[in-house]
Regions:
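Catalytic center-proximal scaffold of phosphoryl-transfer enzymes
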Residues: 1-141
Length: 141
């Protein structure tokens, strides 16, 4: 509400803003459905999730992308319940590129690949905290 007022100078009630959001959601539903079907046909999908706080509670932004098309979903959970509710991964049969979270490995109809960015982050932590030579060499690969 405050953002709309700051941008437009109009003061809208929360109910009015919520109505606009719901109308927009309904109008975009067929586009989202088509986008999901397109992603399901791709040979590889990258997935990740990141937490953020809303009214003192953690919410999770789940991202599914093929590099050209990205869908984002907000869910109060991070793991299996969110994956099931979103419904893309349970239907996906290609290669899932992920951060190695246990919740992804329940789905054996797809193959799994560790995300390179997450791997580099882990190696950096190992080098910084322990100075292991093998981790430093792995980062150079």
């Amino acid at each position: 509400v405050a953002l709309v007022q700051a941008i437009s100078g109009l003061r809208l009630s929360e109910a009015t803003c919520l109505g606009y959001v719901r109308s927009l959601h309904d109008a975009l539903q067929s586009w989202e459905d088509a986008a999901i079907e397109r992603l399901l046909e791709r040979p590889a999908l990258h997935v990740d999730e990141t937490g953020f706080r809303v009214d003192g509670k953690t919410q999770w932004l789940h991202v599914v992308t093929d590099g050209a098309l990205t869908l984002k979903f907000v869910h109060p959970k991070r793991g299996g319940e969110a994956i099931e509710d979103i419904g893309i991964i349970p239907r996906y049969a290609g290669t899932l590129v992920d951060d190695c979270r246990e919740a992804y490995f329940v789905y054996d109809q797809c193959s799994h690949q560790l995300c390179g960015s997450h791997l580099l982050r882990e190696l950096t932590f190992i080098v910084d905290s322990n100075g292991f030579r093998w981790a430093r060499l792995m980062k150079k690969l």
